[in-house]
Amino acid sequence: HPAAEGGVTAASLVADLCADGSRLPVYWCGMYAPCMALFFPVFIEGDLPEVLSVGGGGYSDDSPWWMFYALGQEGFAGGPDRMKEIHEGWWDLQKGMFGSAYAMAGQARGMIDAGDRDAASKMLTDYMAENTANILRVGREILSGAAARTS
């Protein structure tokens, strides 16, 4: 949660390693404050979508981090009810990624073990790109709903 001076966590990463080697590790990334963020799976065996690197010192509609920042600020300003609405807006997408990430991690592990690292990398790259597109779409929908309520 925000400190009195307005500071918050800039991002979070949770590494879900696999002791038995049956799947790849799943790295769950949350941009901005963990209490307001959606966590999405990333795999180092694939290529991250370039849009995730868009940032800068000021707000940009093209930046996922700034979108998460705006959602966080909306939630903090709106209090517990608004935070709950934002979480509910994310829930189906979050639940879907919780369900699909580990299947992808297992499938990619099998492909790599069978010698098809390139195909595994492409599959994971495509998976992360699809998730990122969905995250940006849903996040923008939540923000545009907030803008409509205030106008």
Predicted feature residues:
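C-terminus-biased signal that marks the final domain/tail of proteins
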Residues: 1-151
